[in-house]
């Protein structure tokens, strides 16, 4: 019903373990949207301590592991030439830029992070910034800067988004 409301007419939703999609649907999809489970830092409210109740460093590590598995599966399920959008509602670099860096290391030149295409002008523009170049002394690949961090404001909750194009097959025989 949500897809119909948005005017999407050619959509396949996967119900099941997303980390296994690629095993059943290897290089089958033109477009993939991976809105990954995360530590939800972008949804914290300063005046509501309840929003941080389940946050911990351990939660970030747990989510990072899950996200890496999901992103691997999403890339493997994407057709060469296809586009994947990876998003989270957290600011943790381990879950965002770190996850992208791991994918680049795993897939090499078969994937490319391209500009996320968020507006450079208008009411949201002041809240949009490029992905981090480094975190805690660890440099990320330059391509990771093409991702976008959106800071929370009166219009939006905070989130992270990256657009990845699959340049060639990732199936290795």
Where are these regions (language model features)?
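S-adenosylmethionine
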Residues: 1-173
């Amino acid at each position: 019903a949500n897809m119909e409301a948005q005017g999407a007419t050619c959509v396949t939703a996967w119900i099941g373990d997303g980390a296994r999609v690629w095993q059943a649907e290897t290089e089958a999809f033109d477009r993939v949207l991976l809105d990954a489970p995360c530590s939800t830092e972008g949804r914290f409210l300063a005046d509501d301590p309840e929003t941080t109740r389940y946050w911990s460093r351990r939660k970030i590590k747990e989510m990072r592991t899950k996200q890496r598995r999901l992103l691997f599966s999403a890339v493997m399920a994407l057709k060469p030439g296809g586009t994947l959008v990876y998003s989270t509602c957290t600011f943790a670099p381990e879950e965002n830029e770190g996850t992208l860096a791991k994918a680049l290391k795993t897939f090499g030149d078969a994937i490319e992070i391209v500009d996320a295409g968020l507006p450079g002008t208008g009411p949201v523009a002041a809240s949009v910034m490029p992905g981090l170049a480094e975190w805690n002394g660890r440099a990320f690949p330059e391509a990771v800067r093409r991702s976008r961090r959106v800071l929370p404001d009166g219009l939006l909750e905070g989130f992270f988004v990256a657009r990845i194009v699959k340049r060639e097959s990732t199936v290795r025989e």
